[in-house]
Amino acid sequence: MKNPLLIDNLLSQKDYDNLLKEIKNPKDFDYDAGFSRYLNDHRGLPVLKELSDKLTQTARNIFNSQTLLSTYTLFAHYEGQDPEPSLFKHKDTNACTYTLDMCVYQNEPWDLWVEDKNYTLYPNQALAYYGEDQFHWREKFPSPETNKVAMIFFHFAEPDHWYFTKGSSYIDVIWGKMTEEEWKLKNE
């Protein structure tokens, strides 16, 4: 796969219904003011780990890699006006070699752009793309006074990725929060 791929019915109906039941109130999740979103991962929402495990073989088939492994999965609920939700143009840096971005629910679609092409996702649809290699972003959030959009970001990488060889804390070196030497001392 080279170009992004739109996938219908990423989850079985049973898994999708169970996911909706498990989410409950996303406003109880951690709030990320920078993107105006509420976040949770597998530690706070265990169903995410279950779904990621189930989708690993699907991701292997889509990305033509029988060795990729799940790195982390993140649930994000976007809403509000102060500030409006946003996602700037970027390439991922945190163990997101392969990405499946799934729409969970929405009042109004909020297109995902990958390499200058927009993709409209509907509930239980996903977009497969290379998060670390392809620029992706979202344009202006539609109808911020009423819209709510929830996404799950399923991320995968190869076993030789730093996430597996050095551990998830190595992101501090990637993001320039500490030097390699400082990280080594801290993790001895």
Descriptions of predicted regions:
Residues 1-63:
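Non-heme Fe(II)/2-oxoglutarate
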Residues 59, 66-68, 108:
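Secondary-structure boundary/capping signal
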Residues 61, 66, 149-153:
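Histidine-/acidic-rich catalytic cores in large beta-rich domains
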Residues 64-74:
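A short coil-to-beta-strand element that immediately follows conserved catalytic motifs
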Residues 77:
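Conserved active-site beta-strand element of glycosyltransferases/polysaccharide synthases
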Residues 80-139, 145-152, 157-173:
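Catalytic core of non-heme Fe(II) oxygenases with the double-stranded beta-helix
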Residues 171-188:
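Short, cationic low-complexity segments
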